[in-house]
């Protein structure tokens, strides 16, 4: 299975949700040969619920996946900022992601982000896998987290954007 673990369904988190863009994006993903993707939209994006509501109406449910008309499997997820600096991915059942997003409402603005340990404690209450998003990108501090906290991650995301913009640096850091 060809799977992208870190995909956004919106062009930018401050822009309104666009069904046209999202449909185009998922069509391009399928045309590029992907079988599935994890939709890890920013937790504080505009219209987070609307994006997932739209996908729910345009897909059939198979386990935790939303299967689109073109056959692309979409695994619901979210990208969450942490107080230390950096982003954490969570992927799981749609209901879990939507509930987590609601529970994080008080922590969506800079200055209110949860520290990683508290965020992970929250995620531990749900059937989600949790990973560090693009940990070596400028401004992120995931590699500086204490070793016992790093051990709580299920995976690390090596983002293609990092390879495209500075492959040598990305390879050295990983």
Model-predicted regions and their roles:
Residues 23-25, 117, 141-145, 169-172:
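A generic local structural motif
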Residues 17-18, 22, 29, 36-38, ...:
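Small-side-chain structural scaffolding
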Residues 29, 120-124, 174:
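N-terminal cationic-hydrophobic initiation segments that often serve targeting/anchoring roles
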Residues 58, 161-174:
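Conserved beta-sheet core of the metallophosphoesterase superfamily
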Residues 47-157, 162:
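Extended substrate/RNA-proximal surfaces in nucleic-acid metabolism proteins
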Residues 1-82:
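An N-terminally biased module of ancient metal coordination in phosphate/nucleic-acid-related enzymes
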């Amino acid at each position: 299975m060809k799977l992208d673990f870190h995909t956004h369904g919106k062009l930018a988190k401050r822009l309104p949700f666009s069904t046209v863009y999202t449909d185009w994006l998922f069509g391009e993903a399928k045309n590029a040969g992907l079988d599935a993707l994890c939709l890890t939209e920013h937790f504080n994006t505009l219209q987070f619920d609307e994006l997932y509501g739209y996908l729910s109406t345009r897909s059939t449910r198979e386990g935790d996946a939303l299967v689109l008309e073109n056959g692309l499997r979409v695994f619901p997820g979210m990208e969450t900022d942490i107080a230390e600096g950096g982003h954490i991915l969570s992927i799981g059942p749609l209901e879990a992601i939507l509930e987590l997003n609601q529970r994080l409402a008080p922590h969506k603005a800079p200055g209110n982000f949860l520290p990683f340990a508290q965020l992970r404690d929250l995620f531990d209450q749900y059937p989600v896998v949790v990973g560090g998003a693009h940990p070596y990108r400028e401004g992120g501090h995931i590699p500086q987290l204490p070793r016992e906290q790093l051990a709580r991650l299920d995976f690390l995301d090596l983002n293609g954007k990092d390879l495209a913009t500075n492959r040598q640096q990305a390879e050295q850091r990983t």
